[in-house]
Amino acid sequence: MSIQHTIWKVGVQPVSLSTAKLASEQALEDMIVREPGILSNEWMLIGRQEQTGFGGRIDLLAIAPDGSLVLIELKRNKTPREIVAQALDYAAWVENLTTERIAQIFQRYSNGGSLDQAFQKRFGAKLDEETLNESHQIVLVAAELDDATERIIKYLNDRDIAINVLFFQVFQHGADQLLSRVWMIDPGETQANVATTTKAKGEKEPWNGEYYVSFGTGQSRSWEDARKYGFISAGGGGWYTQTLKLLSPGDRVWVKDPGVGYLGVGRVVDPVVSVNQFTIRTAAGEKPALDVLSTASRLRERADDPDKAEHFVRVQWLDTVSEDKAVNEVGLFGNQNTVCQPTAPKWRHTVERLKQRFTRWGN
């Protein structure tokens, strides 16, 4: 059964608002283009009404911070299962988009804009052509689903096909209309599927059991703190923190600062927790991280926001180096996902090379 949601007017006698309908799918699309946060604050729209070459048009195309693409199909009424087949067909087109083709799509959408400049401005990082469109996800935006469609989507997502549904409902409030929306599946889980299936175009191989971790340093995050106190962390939104849930005690992680290079290898000790729950082992005993870390003042600013707060995974370091001695060579794997399970041959080469540089990796 599709997710149902209602808005109530608060008062001595609460009153539920009556439902309404949008005039057209075009109206919904126009709203999303004007305010992409209706879908996600962590994506950037790059295309609209693009011809697939398969006799159809995709409604919207977005890009995530790791360079993966998001195919978005809009349906204002009940969505039959045939729409899933259509979306999968469109996804086959998205999968084969080249860097040049994606840049052209964005140029049309932005009236001549530069994709790499827009990406840098939006996400604060350089767009890596090697990781652009390594993976993608499908999002259906619909008022409701029939039961068959819902079963199909759950089946696909459970098997690591990154597909989700954003249910929306329109309510009438006097002369105004209000839009409510809710995800069928936690979007972080879908992103975790994207990270799990990330692969280089073309050749791939079974995952080797070694985890890649992106640890971006800055005003809210210090490698020297992480190295000294034994942790990795991420924050700023569910897109960045959700993949930390892929890690379990005993997993081995190879940690890279994308702007610097590889900094260390360690084993996971505890599952992910928020900054308010994470403690630091000091000479004076166990203390809250917010009382110890050098970046604590910045971390406190978002500590009570469950979406934006920093999240931590405790790690036992096996071997580390300072930032000025980071391992950064041509041909080593890199990715913007906080955690992923790469299946590219480059990852096998990277781990083999790193084992030569971080010699205590097996301790």
Each language-model region and where it sits:
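Loop/turn positions that initiate beta-strands
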Residues: P249-V253
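Short, Lys/Arg-enriched phosphate-binding patches
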Residues: L246, Y262, V275-N276
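Residues at beta-strand starts and edge strands
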Residues: G56, S68, Y262, A309-H311
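Aromatic- and Lys/Arg-enriched surface recognition patch
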Residues: R267-P345
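Charged, terminal alpha-helix-loop-beta segments
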Residues: M1-F231, G238-S248, V321, V330-R348, ...
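Short, Lys/Arg- and Gly-enriched loop/turn segments at beta-strand edges
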Residues: V260-R267
